[in-house]
């Protein structure tokens, strides 16, 4: 997923790239909301999100159970490494997510199925992979569903293959993806108790502001922040990214 910093960095290329970046932002879905750990350091340097631990599983669960303006929500935690199947290997990140992540990112399982809530509860060693992963780990064209791939010596059984999305407007391969239950990545791959982010979709684009207000209230309460305390998390919306893009490119022209 393109980050805010990536958006702004790419803007240095100039006005010519504005259209392609705008297209990528719109590809995320106009209702998308991204929550990251750590205070908003707009204009400054943000700490590496993986080093910040202010977003916990309890935060995701509270948002999932209490919000009124979200249609889907998923934790996000990822681990980078080498995928191995037989004599084939490929560098990739395993993204730990929930079942609703497909709806948020507008992904579809084409072969097999998405992992289940039961898989999440049991931290099952299962995964869903994109076409690029299939092509590199199973170049003989065999069906990967049911096969075992290894990541950091952990065996993961492939239960589904995502429908191809190809390259996005910025040349990023959207099929080089591996999805696994977030519990599996947290417990078996990283041994952490915190999240790198939470992704959500508002019920409608018009309800995005209501959703972010609600998210802010719940997280501040969960984190026991006083009225004078700054947020120890950052919320970004697709609409906000578009606004940031427009204002930044306008300054440069």
Question: Across the structure, where does each feature detected by a protein language model lie?
Answer:
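Internal alpha-helical transmembrane segments of multipass membrane proteins
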Residues: 1-5, 144, 250-253
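Short, strongly hydrophobic transmembrane alpha-helices
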Residues: 1-19
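Hydrophobic, regular-secondary-structure patches
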Residues: 15-93, 97-103, 135-136, 186-187, ...
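Residues embedded in well-ordered beta-strands within globular domains across many folds
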Residues: 34, 71-74, 160, 199, ...
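Short, flexible, glycine-rich and Lys/Arg-enriched loop motifs at helix boundaries
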Residues: 40-50, 220-232, 236
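Residue-level detector of beta-strand face positions
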Residues: 82, 146-150, 234
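Mid-to-C-terminal secondary-structure elements
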Residues: 95, 99-115, 119, 124-228
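Peri-transmembrane interface segments
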Residues: 215, 226-253
């Amino acid at each position: 997923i393109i980050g805010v910093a990536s958006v702004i960095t790419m803007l240095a290329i100039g006005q010519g790239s504005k259209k392609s970046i705008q297209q990528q932002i719109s590809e995320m879905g106009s209702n998308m909301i991204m929550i990251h750990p750590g205070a908003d350091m707009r204009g400054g340097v943000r700490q590496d999100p993986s080093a910040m631990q202010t977003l916990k599983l309890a935060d995701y669960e509270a948002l999932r159970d209490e919000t009124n303006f979200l249609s889907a929500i998923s934790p996000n935690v990822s681990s980078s490494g080498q995928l191995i199947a037989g004599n084939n290997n490929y560098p990739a990140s395993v993204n730990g997510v929930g079942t609703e992540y497909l709806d948020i990112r507008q992904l579809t399982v084409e072969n097999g199925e998405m992992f289940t809530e039961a898989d999440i509860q049991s931290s099952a060693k299962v995964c869903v992979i994109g076409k690029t992963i299939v092509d590199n780990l199973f170049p003989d064209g065999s069906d990967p569903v049911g096969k075992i791939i290894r990541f950091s010596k952990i065996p993961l059984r492939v239960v589904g293959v995502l429908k191809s999305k190809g390259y996005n407007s910025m040349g990023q391969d959207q099929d080089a993806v591996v999805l696994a239950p977030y519990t599996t990545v947290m417990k078996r791959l990283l041994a952490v108790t915190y999240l790198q982010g939470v992704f959500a979709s508002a019920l409608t684009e018009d309800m995005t502001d209501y959703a972010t207000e609600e998210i802010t209230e719940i997280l501040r309460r969960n984190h026991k922040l006083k009225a004078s305390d700054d947020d120890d998390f950052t919320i970004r919306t697709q609409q906000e990214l578009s606004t940031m893009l427009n204002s930044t490119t306008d300054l440069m022209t």
